[in-house]
Every structure is written in structure tokens, then in C-alpha cells.
């Protein structure tokens, strides 16, 4: 039906007769001469038709998004008529034959216009996908999937599919449940991850497994979350953290090479505690400096009782400083007020600061600090004339969180972030357990191997867990798993999953661990999130063919939708009025 894609045609084809096919991107009638920009997956080419052509009458019928097959002769555009914005901007096709394969209603959205309301774009997603940008995104997505398969296959991994219909074993989010028609009153769950099945594959001697897995989580949505998503999932037997990290680094190096980036290995490693204390995040963005600095000891003798009391409780409290170089010249009073309002959203009571000026140190904290205290702050933060030092004080968790967010906000405001940089990082030595209102739960998941389970302070128990971070975004992570039944039961006890509940939820895993499970570990990388970062897309919805909205609905198909009474009866379900 066609001899060329649109952008395959160039000056070397001048004089040739070719056939192209695609959609009418734009249509123009200039004094009787018809110009059509034809679009296919590769890009645009201009068709031109004057009244002397036998295709002229047909060309007059063409409108936006009509499906066309065109035959014509390639010629150079006239002097001054070239379009440098197009790959085919130096040539055009003089129409000889034109077939309208299909007409189109007036499109409700402009193809390729990102300023169109997102809900409208999602409702007509099949039109939104016609944009050249969308094609490039899904072309890259396909290439990355192929690179993943080839890279892991070369390393001895087998691609094995795990069940979609499984048992409900909540991993932190709510499960999507599927009622069984055959087993009345019982339900399958869609997997939040293949975690337990891939561990069972290791017990089964598969040695190295991977799949590009579909996962489902019924959780509140954000810009980077979807109820169904894809991850690169893998597991290895007879390995330690270094082995797993090495595979991940090799894989990411191969993936980013496809888009022209050279990644150096090994990636930097940072303990969780260091990440939190110095950057206020377990996924720090290291494309810029601005570390958080502990200055609690500078406030021990402060005349402000609030600060001095905080300084005397270093286990549970923090006083953190953030020195912003040269900020005094660019941060007006209104900007300082905006920053204060920003951190208040995340639990801050306010935002104290010191301005280092030519004529001395100014700011609301000055009167509460001794000369020695001020001197110590300047030494610790390296503050100089023209800088502003911001302070956060209070409960450790809250302070680290809002000061970490402030760090990012300041970097964005001052344009300190190199948008083209790729900064990979491993965050390691995560806490094994986190405190909740009802005791403790597993920080990652309860199948992670703890490092020091006998530690008296449960909050000091660390996990053999690791996250890979790119530019402040968690790409994925993993852990070394528990491979002995006794240890697994011990971890369950720590998080108040006692014997009866453990057998009910995870009896099949505990049983499997009795039969010589090998040491094993693995990882999962968020595939959608990876593509989002590689394409610099604003939302994860841009890199999923048919995404859900932030309300977990599909505007295209109107899913979820009610079902009829007969279907409900077959599933033994009665809805409450």
C-alpha cells in the first residue's frame, strides 16, 4: 500500500514516484493549490496538488484526520519555501493519485496539543496516541523491554510468568479482589507483585527468574502511581546484595545506552540514615548540593527554651540547618513568606532563618543565640556574606521530612538542578521495622532478611534491603530474602503476625521453606516510572497506553461500571442498598 514512510523521503528521492499513507495533519487551500501535511508514525511530509492534477477533486474533499494513501512525484520545494522545522522540509510530493481510505469526524482534541484538558485527552486516548511524541514514547518503551529481555537472558535468567489470580496477602496497599463463581463466597486477589511466587521459583531450583510483570494495587493515586502498573521483576539464587546490585547496574547501563547516555558503574551507595539526616529523604536528589546540617549543639545554651529543649533530646528531636548560598540577594520577604507557608504544609510550625549581611547577622533567631552559638553555626554551615541559613526544629521525622522538601523547593526556585544529569544512587541499610499505632510493621516487606534481628531496640534492626534512585526518584529496589522457616516466623512475630495468622496467610511459603530453600534475593524496577524519566514526561499516564485517571477510572471505556443482577447472582454477591 505504501513504498515509504513519510520521513524516509529526502532530496535523494527527487524525481522518483512514491506512495505514502497516513492521516491528514493539516489542510490548506492557497489560491486553488491544495497543501496537505500527511502524518504517519515517522513524522510529516507535505503533499501538493494543483487543479491540473487528476487527484485535485479528491484533494478538495480532504479534511483533518482523514486517512489517505497518496501517490506522487518527489520534488524540491521552491526557494524560500523550505521548512527547517521538518525533517522533510526541503521536499514535497506532487500528487498524482489520492485515495481517501476513511473519513473522520471533527476531532474533539487537537492531535499533539499537550495543553488540552487531560480528562478530554484520556477520553479520546486513541486520538491522543496519534501524536508523534506518543509514538516515540511507546517505541522507546518497546525497545527498553527488548533490551531488558536480552540483557537478563544473557545473564542466565529465565522469563517465567507467575499467576494473576492468586491469594490475598496484602503487602501494604489494598488488594483488588476477584470473586470466584465456582467457590462460593471466596475470592482471588490480583497480585501487588510476584514476590512470593518468585521466591517459590527459587525454592523450585529455577536459579534466575525474571518477567515484565503486571501488578495491581488499590491505593490512592498520585502523579507517579496507577492502580495497574508494570515492573521489571527478577530473583536470583545463591547471591548477596552485591550480586543483585551488579545485575541492576548492568541492566540500567544497557537501557540508558539505547538513548545515548553512558552510565558509569558502580553506583554510589548511601546508608539510609545518612540519606535521611543529610538530605531529608530516602531517595535524595544528588544533582545539586544543599545538604542538611545538624546544628543542635549550637542551641544547647539558647535563651529560647523550645530550641534548647529540642537540642537536649538528640534521639527523638532534630535541629537542621540549610545554608543557601547567595540567597539574600534573590529571596525577597515575600519569597521567604512563601517558603514558610510551604513547609507548614508538612508539619512545620514556622521557618526560622539567619541572613548573613555585610553589616552583621540578621533574622528572628539572632536574639536567642549567644555569640559563640552564632559562630558555631557559621562554622558548621560554611555560611558567608550573602547567604541565608534556614532552620527546622522539632520531632525528628517531621523535621527531616519538611527540611528535605525545602531543599528541593529551594533548588527548583534557584534553578540549581541540571535537568540533563543522570545521578544514580543506591540507598542501603534500611530499617527492617517501622513503628505504627498498632506496633511495628515491615518497612519493605516481611520476607526481607534482617541483619541484626536480636538487637534489643527493634527500631535499630536493619534490613538486607536496597533501593536504586535516579535524580531523586525511586526507580525500584529489592532485598535478600529470608530462606529459613525459623527466621521467617521470627519476623512475623515481630510484626504481630502470630502462628495461626501466619499459617492462614503464608502457610504455603512456610511449608516451602522447610524443603531446602536456597539463599536468594532480587529486585523490581518500576517500568512505567523508568520510561517516564527517560522521556522526561510529566506524568506516568503519558507512558501507559490506556491509563486510569487519578480517581482510578478509565474515561475511555467508563470502567469501572455496574454489572447486571444475573452476573451478581452467578458470583454469589448481593449489593447493599
Curated annotation (Swiss-Prot):
Chain spans, region Aspartate: 195-198
Record keywords, A-Z: Aminoacyl-tRNA synthetase, ATP-binding, Cytoplasm, Ligase, Nucleotide-binding, Protein biosynthesis
A Pfam family matched in the record: tRNA-synt_2
Catalytic activity: tRNA(Asx) + L-aspartate + ATP = L-aspartyl-tRNA(Asx) + AMP + diphosphate
A GO biological-process term: aspartyl-tRNA aminoacylation
CDD domains: AspRS_core, EcAspRS_like_N
Record text on subunit structure and interactions: Homodimer.
The family this protein is said to belong to: Belongs to the class-II aminoacyl-tRNA synthetase family. Type 1 subfamily.
Name by which UniProt lists this protein: Aspartate--tRNA(Asp/Asn) ligase
Organism of derivation: Helicobacter pylori (strain HPAG1)
Amino acid at each position: 500500500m505504501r513504498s515509504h514512510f513519510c520521513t524516509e523521503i529526502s532530496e535523494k528521492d527527487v524525481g522518483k514516484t512514491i506512495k505514502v499513507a497516513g492521516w491528514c495533519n493539516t489542510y490548506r487551500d492557497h489560491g486553488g493549490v491544495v497543501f496537505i501535511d500527511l502524518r504517519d508514525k515517522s513524522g510529516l511530509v507535505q503533499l501538493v496538488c494543483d487543479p491540473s492534477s487528476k487527484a485535485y477533486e479528491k484533494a478538495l474533499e480532504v479534511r483533518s484526520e482523514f486517512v489517505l494513501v497518496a501517490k506522487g512525484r518527489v520534488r524540491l520545494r521552491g526557494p524560500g519555501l523550505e521548512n527547517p522545522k521538518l525533517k522533510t522540509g526541503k521536499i514535497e510530493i506532487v500528487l498524482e493519485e489520492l485515495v481517501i481510505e476513511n473519513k473522520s469526524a471533527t476531532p474533539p482534541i487537537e492531535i499533539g496539543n499537550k495543553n488540552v484538558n487531560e480528562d478530554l485527552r484520556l477520553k479520546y486516548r486513541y486520538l491522543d496516541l496519534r501524536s508523534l511524541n506518543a509514538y516515540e514514547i511507546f517505541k522507546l518503551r518497546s525497545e527498553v523491554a527488548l533490551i531488558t529481555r536480552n540483557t537478563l537472558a544473557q545473564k542466565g535468567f529465565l522469563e517465567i510468568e507467575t499467576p494473576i489470580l492468586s491469594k490475598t496477602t496484602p503487602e501494604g496497599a489494598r488488594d483488588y479482589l476477584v470473586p470466584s463463581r465456582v467457590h462460593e463466597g471466596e475470592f482471588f486477589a490480583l497480585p501487588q507483585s510476584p514476590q512470593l511466587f518468585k521466591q517459590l521459583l527459587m525454592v523450585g531450583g529455577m536459579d534466575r527468574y525474571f518477567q515484565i510483570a503486571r501488578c495491581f494495587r488499590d491505593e490512592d493515586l498520585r502523579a507517579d502511581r496507577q492502580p495497574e502498573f508494570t515492573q521489571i521483576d527478577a530473583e536470583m539464587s545463591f547471591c548477596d546484595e552485591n550480586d543483585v546490585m551488579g545485575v541492576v547496574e548492568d541492566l540500567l547501563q544497557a537501557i540508558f545506552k539505547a538513548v545515548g547516555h553512558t552510565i558509569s558503574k558502580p553506583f554510589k551507595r548511601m546508608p539510609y540514615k545518612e540519606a535521611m539526616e543529610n538530605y531529608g529523604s530516602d531517595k535524595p536528589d544528588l544533582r545539586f548540593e544543599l545538604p542538611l546540617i545538624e546544628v543542635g549543639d549550637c542551641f544547647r545554651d539558647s535563651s529560647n527554651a523550645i530550641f534548647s529543649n529540642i537540642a537536649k533530646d538528640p534521639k527523638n528531636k532534630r535541629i537542621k540547618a540549610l545554608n543557601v548560598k547567595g540567597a539574600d540577594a534573590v529571596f525577597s520577604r515575600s519569597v521567604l513568606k512563601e517558603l514558610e507557608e510551604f513547609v507548614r504544609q508538612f508539619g512545620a510550625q514556622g521557618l526560622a532563618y539567619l541572613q548573613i549581611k555585610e553589616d552583621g547577622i540578621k533574622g528572628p533567631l539572632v536574639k536567642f543565640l549567644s555569640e559563640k552559638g552564632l559562630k558555631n553555626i557559621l562554622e558548621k554551615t560554611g555560611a558567608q556574606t550573602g547567604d541565608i541559613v534556614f532552620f527546622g526544629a522539632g520531632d525528628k521525622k517531621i523535621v527531616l521530612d519538611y527540611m528535605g522538601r525545602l531543599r528541593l523547593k529551594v533548588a527548583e526556585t534557584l534553578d540549581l538542578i541540571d535537568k540533563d544529569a543522570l545521578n544514580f544512587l543506591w540507598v542501603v541499610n534500611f530499617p527492617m521495622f517501622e513503628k505504627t499505632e498498632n506496633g511495628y510493621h515491615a518497612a519493605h516487606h516481611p520476607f526481607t532478611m534482617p541483619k541484626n534481628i536480636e538487637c534489643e531496640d527493634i527500631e535499630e534492626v536493619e534490613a538486607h534491603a536496597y533501593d536504586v534512585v535516579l535524580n531523586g526518584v525511586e526507580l525500584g529496589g529489592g532485598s535478600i530474602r529470608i530462606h529459613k522457616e525459623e527466621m521467617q516466623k521470627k519476623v512475623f512475630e515481630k510484626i504481630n503476625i502470630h502462628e495461626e495468622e501466619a499459617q492462614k496467610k503464608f502457610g504455603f511459603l512456610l511449608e516451602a521453606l522447610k524443603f531446602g530453600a536456597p539463599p536468594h534475593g532480587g529486585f523490581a524496577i518500576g517500568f512505567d516510572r523508568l520510561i517516564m524519566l527517560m522521556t522526561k514526561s510529566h506524568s506516568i499516564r503519558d507512558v501507559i497506553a490506556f491509563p486510569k485517571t487519578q480517581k482510578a477510572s478509565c474515561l475511555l471505556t467508563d470502567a469501572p461500571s455496574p454489572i447486571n443482577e444475573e452476573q451478581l447472582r452467578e458470583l454469589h454477591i448481593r449489593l447493599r442498598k
